Amino acid sequence: MSADPINDQSSLCVRCNKSIASSQVYELESKKWHDQCFTCYKCDKKLNADSDFLVLDIGTLICYDCSDKCTNCGDKIDDTAIILPSSNEAYCSNCFRCCRCSNRIKNLKYAKTKRGLCCMDCHEKLLRKKQLLLENQTKNSSKEDFPIKLPERSVKRPLSPTRINGKSDVSTNNTAISKNLVSSNEDQQLTPQVLVSQERDESSLNDNNDNDNSKDREETSSHARTVSIDDILNSTLEHDSNSIEEQSLVDNEDYINKMGEDVTYRLLKPQRANRDSIVVKDPRIPNSNSNANRFFSIYDKEETDKDDTDNKENEIIVNTPRNSTDKITSPLNSPMAVQMNEEVEPPHGLALTLSEATKENNKSSQGIQTSTSKSMNHVSPITRTDTVEMKTSTSSSTLRLSDNGSFSRPQTADNLLPHKKVAPSPNKKLSRSFSLKSKNFVHNLKSKTSEMLDPKHPHHSTSIQESDTHSGWGVSSTHTNIRKSKAKKNPVSRGQSDSTIYNTLPQHGNFTVPEFNHKKAQSSLGSISKKQNSNDTATNRRINGSFTSSSSGHHIAMFRTPPLESGPLFKRPSLSSESAHHRSSSLQTSRSTNALLEDDSTKVDATDESATSLEKDFYFTELTLRKLKLDVRELEGTKKKLLQDVENLRLAKERLLNDVDNLTREKDKQSASSRESLEQKENIATSITVKSPSSNSDRKGSISNASPKPRFWKIFSSAKDHQVGDLESQQRSPNSSSGGTTNIAQKEISSPKLIRVHDELPSPGKVPLSPSPKRLDYTPDGSHLYGSSLQARCAYEKSTVPIIIRCCIDRIEKDDIGLNMEGLYRKSGSQTLVEEIENEFAQNNSLHSDTLSPKLNALLNQDIHAVASVLKRYLRKLPDPVLSFSIYDALIDLVRNNQLIERLPLNNDKFLDSPQKVTIYEMVLKSLLEIFKILPVEHQEVLKVLAAHIGKVRRCSERNLMNLHNLSLVFAPSLIHDFDGEKDIVDMKERNYIVEFILGNYRDIFKQA
């Protein structure tokens, strides 16, 4: 785009909204800017007419570098730019399309997605599709929420029998219980029965023989049968017995060889009751010479309540651990074997060492028991698990439960002297606990044990997802949601045992189970006191040696590995007092010395957890408050700095305004002085006497040798247009010079200079407006093509019209090609060709066109536009234009005072369509005749020749597209202009009108003359 600088005192600048004085301004589509305001609104880059920039509707100027690029195609947007308000992204009108249907987005309504812009139709379709998908997912999820139906126990599966050495004590109650259990499975789809084995050892304590005999007589719930170990395994793992590998049987061969003589099983009936606790009775078997080892099925992380001090009633109440959500979803998922041994034997393998302080704590914890049970064969709710537990020996070290109900360690040499080694008992037997494990776990048991014994193998708690167990006969596998402990977990040491063994709790009196509500243990393992001595640490280390999986839900008692001798291998300290073990009964037994079953501790733990949560909230709130205070302080500093910057800018603005006022006053003073000087020089110019045409040399002295170029072309014309010199003066001979060497203007002809009448020297004080520092000296003889007046050049060539004008017109009118050339006199020719033609005309010594040099003829025949450009440039560079300075004001006043532009428009050929216009037309002709009387004869002749030539071009306007109005606009700057070029813009309309009137009516004008 381009803009034109104009002078208009009545308009305002678009950018600064200040009035525009006579300084240079830019005008574009009725919008005007100061010269200093015509810059890019983003980068303040100076713009001009040749710059590539955009103009917004509000008048904002944007240069090409700052214009927006399309986000999609990356091209510069030169028309309408669509900018998204959210992301400030720009799109061209072609790329503003929907990414799905590729249609143009209507009404600027769109939805932005990850793929791109979407029209509203596609967006609504997408929303409906998502809503339909969400509804389908909701329906599917509601259909899947149904309770898991447990499969019925197969009636073909035989009940597990009991083998007794030589005899069997079967009461009538056993048969009734068995029948009730079978019928309950058929009628109520309850979970399978739980078998609790009661094994008898060959030795027992003497002080409990009487109690054993009495309790054996009262036992009414045992169902004894004799069966082999192989039958037990086959009946237990019925569904996967074919896939158990032979290696698993070989591993159990040692245990089968050392198995006790008889095994007693009790068939316990599960009930639909509260699953929070399990009460397991330990009835005595009538054998005074045997040590009763009994196994009970318990929950993970069990805790044992103690009996009262009267020792009348004795029971084991196993509490289920309470997780963080106070909800147990899988009770009795992992039944464990509890061996109750009353015989004091030297510990072997994973010996448990309890300190004296621990023993005292055990004794002091007698008062925190729940109510005792009084029925014999009643087990509180045991569901979803069936367990077959076998008789074991006392090879592993055990915790004994004393008669008063408190746990205690056997007083062995290992307890009193931990540094000494104790010889193993000769009657040691291998103790194993068989459970319903899957074939994969049994198959991999040997490799896992070897990995745990590997000194380089790090032992960690097994996650829930890694467990591979068999949950029982037809019991669905469900995981229990247990919140992970934040503390570090206790590392599992080498040589872990697969089962947990407890000492036998002495039983007294009748075994009945009263109705009671058992509370869940809230403290679990996390409330263990940290104040433990070195013996407690060693005890925990040995307790942690029992191999229990940390998984919840599906794990049950695992095959027990042979015990290892205690040694330095197990002396590594525990890393934490808290652990995620779910099945470590030994660990919980040792930690029961801290009264874990107190209901008060449950409340304290809940209070501590709540207090910890409040402390964390307070801590984070305080950190947030500190951060906000720092932000406020930083913002206050920024505000102070910005206020200081604003104050500095305000002071700078005041200083600049003062400077502007001072410069404005100085400018007004200089303008007034320049106007006075101009008036004086105009008076001097009018007083110059004009001689007759015969004395051309005297007449040439009154006119400057160079015409001023209007300020408009001076600013916006290219550099090549300025580089036009007087080529003829460079080739002139020394004899033709009347005084010294002539300076030739290389860029522009300097402004007209007043020449004194007598000595023909330039008048001092006149400052040329042309930026060119060089000027042409006056040549009165007319030998210079450029620099000589029209009269002097015609006198030099002895013709009425200069040869350059005649040659150019003849070349254009030579054939129809020149006259029919589109854009004739409007399009510019090659700058190089134009300069070459001018140089040849300046060097041409012949004064006749028919004797032109061959080179000049060849140049003239190359391009018609170049020939037309040469003609226009010569007319524009005349020191005194064709319509000379002497008649300039008279012509302008004729148009302006009579309002000819409005009263006599020249828009068509029939402008004389009314008598009033005819009268005005005749008045204008008479006025022009009077004015042309002052005009020199050479000027009149050139004007006639040009008018006739333009008439011919005008008649071919259908092909060359140059009508009279267009030709007048092209030739007006070359035919008429003021003395110093200051009125070019102000008088532009009047100049164009008078040129068009003269060229269109030249016959009427010169006919009357």
Swiss-Prot record:
User: Where in this chain does the record put each LIM zinc-binding domain?
Assistant: 11-68, 69-129
- Annotated GO MF terms: GTPase activator activity; identical protein binding; metal ion binding
Which Pfam families does the annotation name? LIM, RhoGAP
- Example GO BP: establishment of cell polarity
List, alphabetically, the GO terms of the cellular component aspect: cell cortex; cell division site; cell tip; cellular bud; cellular bud neck split septin rings; plasma membrane; site of polarized growth
Q: Which UniProt keywords apply?
A: GTPase activation, LIM domain, Metal-binding, Phosphoprotein, Repeat, Zinc
Q: Which residues carry this modification: Phosphoserine?
A: 763
List the SUPFAM superfamilies. Answer: GTPase activation domain, GAP
**Sequence ranges of Polar residues compositional bias:** 162-196, 363-385, 399-414, 493-510, 522-553, 683-707, 728-749
- Stretch list, region Disordered: 143-228, 358-433, 449-608, 664-709, 723-780
Q: Spans of biased composition, class Basic residues?
A: 481-491
Q: Where is this site: Arginine finger?
A: 826
CDD domains for the chain: LIM1_Rga, LIM2_Rga, RhoGAP
KW Metal-binding (keyword) present = yes
- Residues in domain Rho-GAP? 788-1006
Q: Where is the composition biased (Basic and acidic residues)?
A: 143-155, 212-222, 664-682
- Could you tell me which PROSITE patterns the record lists for this protein? LIM_DOMAIN_1 (PS00478), LIM_DOMAIN_2 (PS50023), RHOGAP (PS50238)
Function noted in UniProt:
GTPase-activating protein (GAP) for CDC42 and/or RHO1.
Q: Other notes on this protein?
A: Present with 254 molecules/cell in log phase SD medium.
Q: What is this protein called?
A: Rho-type GTPase-activating protein 2
Tell me the organism.
Saccharomyces cerevisiae (strain ATCC 204508 / S288c) (Baker's yeast)
Q: What is the lineage of its organism?
A: Eukaryota, Fungi, Dikarya, Ascomycota, Saccharomycotina
